[in-house]
Amino acid sequence: MFANIGWGEMLVLVIAGLVILGPERLPGAIRWTSGALRQARDYVSGATSQLRQDLGPEFDDLREPLQELQKLRGMTPRAAITKHLLDGDDSFLTGKFDDERPKQQPQTPAAQDKPEEKPDKPAGPVFDPDAT
């Protein structure tokens, strides 16, 4: 629950607690908060163990679809489509097909290397600032 709270944030919370509650009531508030969190954690673990006892081996069958959903949460839309609809073949989405292999150009001696000349026309489309 507090896995992504760093020491800096904890320090800000303690200072805010000192300002809001004062030094007299802060230790009691910390004890109450830690007790409430501990009790909530015990309730959750108790509910999990009770479900495990009630369902028996079916509990693991219930967890499998949840684990599959957890795997899907981390996927991007492109990865999900590639995995489930295209069987891992993303050439349809990337446009890189097997029969189009990059052709290797013959190597020329280094003495004949010339600096590339800039083309007269821009490489991209013409930009028209008046177009809407």
Swiss-Prot record:
<feature type="region of interest" description="Disordered">
    <location>
        <begin position="91"/>
        <end position="132"/>
    </location>
</feature>
<dbReference type="InterPro" id="IPR018448">
    <property type="entry name" value="TatB"/>
</dbReference>
<keyword id="KW-0812">Transmembrane</keyword>
<protein>
    <recommendedName>
        <fullName>Sec-independent protein translocase protein TatB</fullName>
    </recommendedName>
</protein>
<keyword id="KW-0813">Transport</keyword>
<dbReference type="GO" id="GO:0033281">
    <property type="term" value="C:TAT protein transport complex"/>
</dbReference>
<comment type="similarity">
    <text>Belongs to the TatB family.</text>
</comment>
<keyword id="KW-0472">Membrane</keyword>
<dbReference type="GO" id="GO:0043953">
    <property type="term" value="P:protein transport by the Tat complex"/>
</dbReference>
<dbReference type="GO" id="GO:0008320">
    <property type="term" value="F:protein transmembrane transporter activity"/>
</dbReference>
<comment type="function">
    <text>Part of the twin-arginine translocation (Tat) system that transports large folded proteins containing a characteristic twin-arginine motif in their signal peptide across membranes. Together with TatC, TatB is part of a receptor directly interacting with Tat signal peptides. TatB may form an oligomeric binding site that transiently accommodates folded Tat precursor proteins before their translocation.</text>
</comment>
<keyword id="KW-1133">Transmembrane helix</keyword>
<keyword id="KW-0811">Translocation</keyword>
<feature type="transmembrane region" description="Helical">
    <location>
        <begin position="2"/>
        <end position="22"/>
    </location>
</feature>
<keyword id="KW-0653">Protein transport</keyword>
<keyword id="KW-1003">Cell membrane</keyword>
<comment type="subunit">
    <text>The Tat system comprises two distinct complexes: a TatABC complex, containing multiple copies of TatA, TatB and TatC subunits, and a separate TatA complex, containing only TatA subunits. Substrates initially bind to the TatABC complex, which probably triggers association of the separate TatA complex to form the active translocon.</text>
</comment>
